[in-house]
Amino acid sequence: MRKTKIVCTIGPASESPELLEQLIEAGMNVARLNFSHGNHAEHKARIDSIRKVAREKGKVVGILLDTKGPEIRTHSMMNGKLELVTGQKIDISMTQVEGNNDVFSVSYDKLIEDVNEGSVILLDDGLIQLEVTGKDVARGLIHTLIINSGSLSNNKGVNIPGVSVQLPGMTEKDAEDILFGIREGVDFIAASFVRRASDVMEIRALLENNNGSNLQIIPKIENQEGVDNIDEILNVSDGLMVARGDLGVEIPPEEVPLVQKNLIEKCNQAGKPVITATQMLDSMQRNPRPTRAEASDVANAIFDGTDAIMLSGETAAGIYPVESVQTMDRIALTTEAAIDYRSVVSTRRREKHGNMTEAIGQAAAYTAINLKVKAVLAPTESGHTAKMIAKYRPGCPVIAVTSSEMCSRKLSLIWGVYPIVGKKASSIDEILQESVEESVKHQYVGHGDVVIITAGVPVGEAGTTNLMKIHVIGDLLARGQGIGKDVAYGRTVVAKNAAEALAYDTEGAILVTNASDRDMMPAIEKCAGLITEEGGLTSHGAIVGLSLGIPIIVGVENATELIQHGKEITMDAESGVIYNGHASVL
């Protein structure tokens, strides 16, 4: 099972119910809605479709609202665009004007206060570079020199690398969009152009004052100021997005890979999800196959430790949206198979942990790797336990069983976590039973698999995880008194007396009988294990089994009736348990 999550941007190329169904089947975990485009009616229709299709498919899909953010853009140009020529001069006006060969204006009227002579201004994703040569504050004009030629059209992005601007953390449009998201029940807010912790707190205050405190805030790090303030930003956030598009314009491109690794590592240490985004499979907007560099980019983000990888134009507007998700899924699966999870968990074990839940998470991950378990089952009310286990990268899926749909969608972004919505349990026994039954029902685990189950007392209270159990998921057939510590697996021979036992080939079989005796010895000597209805450590079966060194289970009531002849079973002498089929027993 793939552990790295896939975030898909939903747009005209993917908004139909048919395409959404295909994206979910291909592996989409979180649907991103880009509020830089479209109106509330369009986004509501998309949200409704995503929820409906996910419900019909029985899948958990989170919804991420990506704000437009406090960006700077150019205003309109005469005839739609200007031709800027290297070496010529052009002014930037703080008052809105129609752009011409002498002057154009931008949407941020305090730009003149933020730049100085020598400052660099980048236009249209950095394709055009201007250098500030002077300012006329009285007239509200910035004088610039055109460093490289290009066509400048309407509403193009403006970046000022290395300059701290006075833009607000949240615009009026952002606030309206976030309130819309609260009403529609989205799960995550991706906050664009976050520069400092106060930007995040401004959004959090809006959420808390409007019954939206359950929404998680994922700041997008897109400028040098955000990079410089990353620790304070992460402290007040629920995760991060490495938004490499604007980031690669705001800082030198050669620094982007280093910043990416640094941000991912900080999120890993904090146990918070991180999304790596922008141009991951960009060529698949037009082509059915990615470039080799793109495949390596996705793989390296996974090696870095990212929780999620994101598709933007590939799924929103591209020709091959489903193929893009399928490709990303294959790259992720192949990459994850090459990761040394023992090394990862050993490195993270050296970090300090300050609470019981995290200690259990660390222990569960380490034990999962040592025992090569099929999954870790983590019943949870808040999702915190599942996050803490995933933080230590157990190398197997973390199945988070919760009674809250909201909690399940929050976990859709967490590495390795597969949420299931189940019934609310009121006791430890119910928790264990519910988590196993739901995991089997969803086919994440099967009979015979070894799993780890975490739980907490008192039941139902967040942050009380204090129990870890190693459990064999088995189709339990019968139970008795085991003698010895061995396990036997094989075909059964059911015989009620010596004559029946000797009539069958017992070589390597498990002999099931009422009670053994001296006449049955030739059959017993060839068998792999012995099960008797007769109980007691002094019974013939117990004594003979010990002398032969084979696993024995005695005192199994109605064994010759319960256990069918010729069936494959597993007997665990240490626990005295008999399972149908081939069960993994520790």
Swiss-Prot record:
It catalyses: pyruvate + ATP = phosphoenolpyruvate + ADP + H(+). It is an enzyme of class 2 (transferase). The record marks K220 as: Transition state stabilizer. K(+) binds at N34, S36, D66, T67. Keywords: ATP-binding, Glycolysis, Kinase, Magnesium, Metal-binding, Nucleotide-binding, Potassium, Pyruvate, Transferase. It holds the Pfam family PEP-utilizers. Its EC number is 2.7.1.40. It comes from the Bacteria. Belongs to the pyruvate kinase family. This is Pyruvate kinase.
